[in-house]
Amino acid sequence: MSLQTLPSDAADSRPNRPEDVQALEADARLRDDIRLLGRILGDTVRDQEGADLFDLVERIRQTSIRFHRDEDRLARRELEQILDSMSTSETVRIVRAFSYFSHLANIAEDQNNIRQMRARTAAKIGGSGVLADTLAHAKAAGIGPDALRNFFKTALVSPVLTAHPTEVRRKSTMDREMEVASLLDRRERVALTEDEAAASDEQLRREVLTLWQTNLLRRTKLTVLDEVANGLSFYDYTFLREVPRLVNVLEDRLEEDGDQAASELASFLRMGSWIGGDRDGNPFVTADVMRGTLRLQSSRVMQFYLNELHVLGSELSIAAHLADVSEELRTLAERSPDTSPHRSGEPYRLAVSGIYARLTATAEALEVEITRRPVGKGRPYESVKELQADLDVLHRSLISNNARVIARGRLRLLRRAVDCFGFHLARLDIRQNSAVHERTIAELMDAANPGMSYLALGEDARISLLTNELRSTRALVSPFVKYSDETMGELNVFHAAAEAHAKFGSDAIPQCIISMCKGMSDMLEVAVLLKEVGLVHPSGRSAINIVPLFETIEDLQASSAIMDRMLSLHDYRRLVDSRGSVQEVMLGYSDSNKDGGFVTSGWELYKAEINLVDVFERHHVRLRLFHGRGGSVGRGGGPSYDAIIAQPGGAVNGQIRITEQGEIISSKYSNAEVGRNNLEILAAATLEASLLHPRQSAPRREYLTAMDELSSLAFRAYRGLVYETDGFVDYFWASTVINEIATLNIGSRPASRKKTRAIEDLRAIPWVFSWAQCRLMLPGWYGFGTAVEQWIAEHPDKGMPFLKELYKEWPFFRMLLSNMDMVLAKSSIAIASRYAELVPDEALREKIFGRIRREWHSCIETLLDIMGQDRLLQGNPLLERSVRHRFPYLDPLNHVQVELLREHRAQNPDEQVLRGIQLTINGISAGLRNTG
């Protein structure tokens, strides 16, 4: 298997800029790496499966290229004949070969990205999202180090990991792939001798062979705690070191321009998590699972601290008779239980031993598992602040005795890590659907007030009842009433949250998120439940943030009015003021897209932000937006930097939280260097959006009006297809892998909210996932072409020139089209036509697919016209080449998937057929690099 047959990517013109030359050189190396890995995989397939299978792979690939290029009918028939002639066993092995090539190509691409990052850094070439570049812009704008330090005192940048089931790879596969990446990296960094190069080749072959002989698929369904463990692995790979390192690097850059004696920079970068706390639609996230999650998180960070202290103790071999130490350091050393005579004159080592002993005692008190043991008994730390105080003693002693360079080593990283991660590691959000809270409150209220029917009350009556309950000092829950299992389950979760605050600190669970929030009562119900466990007090204090999540188009439109009334409500406003006058609001990208389509979802989210900013400014409350974005464009995905910069003025304001989901977590954070760059991008974009254009000039009124009209037209086109076309549900279930996705064992959560086939009840992830697999990516573009055509027809005086102006002048519109450009480049109407053939009703197939095909062509034509491009991704040549490189290995997987689906749905009970389908889903996901 080789890339020798791929088209050449020679430059269209001679490059002039240094960065262009570097990009071309890096691209040439990328091709070399892909050829190397492709050759090794091909040799592995030939050795393990025989020359006949290898030749079959090549025949399928070549025929697929002809079909993709021009929908060659002869190629289609030839492909069908080849696939029909294969046994199930051959099919499975063919799928594995193409899938693994996609996996290996991804590794090569990731290494190429690292290579280019290093080249830019070495050449001091700035780029979007590079923190140094952003700081230079701030300096040029007259924003000095002191102003930046003040900004970061209240800033918050928080990536939030979720367990959304879009990562189809097993951890075993990811571990092997990381070894391949490490070997490629070493070849890049080190000039190898001939023997070393041969050994490196052999190691690569060994890893690829191990991959070939490793199961791509999970045999059993993941549990919630499995998902927690998978999420925690990224702390080992990246977060535990790179989060504190990034804050320290920023601190150093500010010191270069300011006072080196200035106070330390606030730790503005905080990790969040939903894994083990997200109960919306997942019955397996219980109070006990949440407790287990918190213990696992704490165990991981405690083990990290103990390992660092162990190494720090060996490093700080400073003898008391050779260097002065502070009195407080001597006191700390004297408290150490370490009685070894070898360390009697080494106060720093004794002090570290004492800290180590106290930390292990703390882990034991928190019921957290650790593998290391102390040299003696210590007293547990009451809080993380006590641990910080002891580490500060070490720091001050080193600084006061002219050992600043030592203080800035491992100790500095550890002190920053403790500040960032505490004893809890990540801030765990708890989330539940508003309907569950409503049923819980209804049962409690009806039991406490005989004759009441809470569910029959109107919104105003509920608000009055709930605010009275918030002020009441009596308990609503009675020990003499037997409540339903659902109600007890909810109450137990809130009790577990209160326990977490007592054990790990208030940062352990700082947010309670309300999914499908539709009114004020949804938020007040949660406040009352929190009061029952002591996290909200009748006096108006709250130990936790109550966060509404607005998800549907209708709810986004109502969000600012709801928050306006909430902030005007005295009893709720007291709770907000007790939280520093900061109110978080979460915006859902996934369900709004499924509800109203890509264009309308993006526009309603943007308008909701504008309106929320205005409301919060009137109430003098700080707005923190939490963006619930997925990996795919159909669920709000796309480049993070562009997304943050395109926010309306005032929407970032120094604080932002963003979900990182599924396959996006591994692509961004499984490699420390890539992870550092992605964290830097988030920090830089937040800084730039907040300080450099905090109140960027509002878009012109005619821009907003045009976007309103385009959105309305796109909404009608999308809803007309998805919700108003007879037979669409049947078409969707027949032409996609929606049924088969549920068999993948990639997550603990069910795929649908209810056991129906209705689109309304389907979760956004399998909805988007299914359209990606058949290569239509419909949620990422449908309706735009029709909207533009109709808008131009209605506005002949403005027409296309006005839309081109919109694209040139307005970051929001530019980002919207850029994301569509990427999605459409990965789509293939030729491949999609083969999935349409799976619909048994020919009239239905032609009616719906014909409509989709026309919209696809219209969308591409109008998009290219507005962007001034001749082809998709013309403005992003690296991504264009990446996508084009993938098709020869991605398309065959789609062809095989169609044939396997046809066979499986013909009531073939063969387990190998289902396994083959699952393998194609895995391979296509890898080839697309984002799925749901």
Curated annotation (Swiss-Prot):
PROSITE patterns in the cross-refs: PEPCASE_1 (PS00781), PEPCASE_2 (PS00393)
Q: SUPFAM superfamilies recorded for this chain?
A: Phosphoenolpyruvate/pyruvate domain
Keyword tags: Carbon dioxide fixation, Lyase, Magnesium
CC cofactor? Mg(2+)
Query: What EC number(s) is this enzyme filed under?
Result: 4.1.1.31
Q: Which GO terms describe its biological process?
A: carbon fixation; oxaloacetate metabolic process; tricarboxylic acid cycle
Q: Looking at its record, which EC class is this enzyme?
A: lyase
Pfam families associated with the record? PEPcase
Q: Which InterPro entries match?
A: PEP_COase (IPR021135), PEP_COase_bac/pln-type (IPR022805), PEP_COase_Lys_AS (IPR018129), PEPCASE_His_AS (IPR033129), Pyrv/PenolPyrv_kinase-like_dom (IPR015813)
Q: Give the residues annotated as coiled coil.
A: none
* Keyword Magnesium attributed: yes
Cellular component, GO annotation: cytosol
The entry lists its GO molecular-function terms as: magnesium ion binding; phosphoenolpyruvate carboxylase activity
Catalytic reaction list? oxaloacetate + phosphate = phosphoenolpyruvate + hydrogencarbonate
The lineage's top-level taxon is: Bacteria
Q: Where is the active site?
A: H164, K594
| NADP listed as a keyword | no
Its biological purpose is as follows:
Forms oxaloacetate, a four-carbon dicarboxylic acid source for the tricarboxylic acid cycle.
Q: Which HAMAP family match?
A: PEPcase_type1 (MF_00595)
* Assigned protein family: Belongs to the PEPCase type 1 family.
How is this protein named in the record? Phosphoenolpyruvate carboxylase
Q: Which organism is it from?
A: Bradyrhizobium diazoefficiens (strain JCM 10833 / BCRC 13528 / IAM 13628 / NBRC 14792 / USDA 110)
Q: Identify the gene encoding this protein.
A: ppc
